[in-house]
Regions:
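Conserved acetyl-CoA-binding loop-helix of GNAT-fold acetyltransferases
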Residues: 65, 71-84
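Short amphipathic alpha-helix that is part of the acyltransferase structural core
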Residues: 1-26
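Short loop/turn motifs at secondary-structure junctions and domain boundaries
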Residues: 27-31
Length: 101
């Protein structure tokens, strides 16, 4: 299992992100300003996008696990990775919720 940052061609991963947020224009917005990570275990199993919200707050804008791989700990692994990676930079890790109907 490997977690890596995605710096280019982020939209190639949009299908999985759309599972967690149906508004593609919102995804486009936070992909531009956010940092994206994918978790690979043979292939992409999960992904997330985080943004710096200021005042020591890091927000998870989107986190999605491939439906066939849910319940296998991939989402937890991403959360644990983020908490560890950003522990010294941020005092709060929060999950944003969408305003989609």
């Amino acid at each position: 299992m490997k977690i890596r940052e995605v710096n280019e061609n982020k939209k190639q991963f949009i299908a999985l992100l759309l599972l967690a947020d149906e508004q593609e224009n919102m995804i486009d917005h936070y992909l531009e300003k956010g940092t994206m990570y994918v978790l690979e275990d043979g292939n992409v199993k999960a992904e997330c996008v985080v943004t710096d919200e200021g005042n020591g707050i890091l927000e998870i804008k989107n986190i999605a696990v491939d439906p066939e791989n849910q319940g296998k700990g991939y989402g937890k692994a991403l959360i644990d990775f983020l908490a560890s990676k950003y522990a010294d930079e941020y005092s709060v890790l929060q999950v944003g919720t969408g305003d989609s109907p």
